[in-house]
From Swiss-Prot:
GO terms for molecular function: metal ion binding; RNA binding; RNA-directed DNA polymerase activity. Coiled coil: none annotated. One of its GO terms (biological process) is defense response to virus. Mg(2+) binds at D97, D185, D186. Keywords: Antiviral defense, Magnesium, Metal-binding, Nucleotidyltransferase, RNA-binding, RNA-directed DNA polymerase, Transferase. PROSITE patterns: RT_POL. This is Retron Ec83 reverse transcriptase. Belongs to the bacterial reverse transcriptase family.
Length: 312
């Protein structure tokens, strides 16, 4: 199956060829945001023009590529809650994290993934994908190209790259009565069988090497084995011992404190919008908690938070 991205974009953007020659892989604004624990995360955001073309490219790729069902991030109709639900009834849990995930994905990994899916792409279209969907950190003429955190095309491309990996890991897990899901760089495994999650851990190591060499690796500082005897969390959602999903005590306290500050008029615009997102997240996971907030602070307060976020 052959795809022609160039012709479609040339029709949509009269100045497309000029923009391509201007090395769009360097058209990024770079800034840092602090991580939850230590250090900073580098965000590289493309210019609005490049961003628009990235979105168009993804729409074209969606018509010709396959994303595995194990992928739950950046997939239409799936979210963090769906990812957690996969594991809510299991006793044993394993969580793995991939090091600097987006920044480890290169054009070559994408092209290999497309070839595995029998997608034929010309050198011209490969160059187009390199320039518009990858970030040249150094801005040098032959600088290394990687996916950036901040580009709208990065999530979908990462799912294409990981598709064959997800397929192999899913098959292994099915044979061993293990549930598997991947939310971007967060890999979660769960089971009711004793002593099998270590096998999954080893399988991930060997499968990463087979598909990516040493390019994409496990973060050994973030390996978590857990069970119902301990607190279990999957992509920010707490799994309770009675097979329910919960926000967890710490997050509930945090949201409650923000609602109190909102009512006192002590939150900035940015904080209010952040709170709005948390309220929506909480309602999807534990609606009874939102009902308790409404009783404590008034329904009008919670409605005001939602209304504010909508620009009202």
């Amino acid at each position: 199956m052959s795809i022609d991205i160039e012709t479609t974009l040339q029709k949509a953007y009269p100045d497309f060829d000029v923009l391509l020659k201007s090395r769009p892989a360097t058209h990024y604004k770079v800034y840092k945001i602090p991580k939850r624990t230590i250090g900073y995360r580098i965000i590289a955001q493309p210019t609005p023009r490049v961003k628009a073309i990235q979105r168009d490219i993804i729409e074209i790729l969606k018509q010709h590529t396959h994303i595995h069902d194990a992928a739950t991030a950046y997939v239409d109709g799936k979210n963090i809650l769906d990812n957690a639900k996969i594991h809510q009834s299991s006793v044993y849990l394993l969580k793995l994290d991939l090091v600097n995930f987006f920044n480890k994905i290169t054009p070559e990994l994408l092209f290999k993934a497309l070839a595995r899916q029998k997608v034929d792409i010309s050198d011209t279209n490969k160059n187009l994908l390199k320039q518009f969907c990858f970030w040249n950190r150094t801005k040098r003429k032959n600088g290394a190209l990687v996916l950036s955190v901040g580009a709208p095309s990065s999530p979908f491309i990462s799912n294409i790259v990981m598709s064959s990996f997800d397929e192999e890991i899913s098959s292994f897990c099915k044979e061993n009565k293990i549930s598997y899901s991947r939310y971007a760089d967060d890999l979660t495994f769960s089971t009711n069988e004793r002593d099998v999650l270590g096998l999954a851990h080893q399988k991930v190591k060997t499968t990463l090497i087979r598909f990516f060499g040493t390019r994409i690796i496990i973060n050994n500082n973030k390996i978590v084995y857990s069970s119902k005897a301990h607190n279990r969390h999957v992509t920010g959602v707490t799994l309770t011992n009675n097979n329910k999903l919960s926000l967890g005590r710490e997050r509930k306290r945090y949201i409650t404190s923000l609602v109190f500050k909102f009512k006192e008029g002590k939150l900035s615009n940015v904080d209010i919008n952040h709170l709005r997102g948390l309220i929506g997240f909480a309602y999807n996971i534990e609606p009874a908690f939102i009902e308790r907030l409404e009783k404590k602070y008034g329904e009008s307060t919670i409605k005001s938070i939602k209304k504010y976020s909508e620009g009202g």
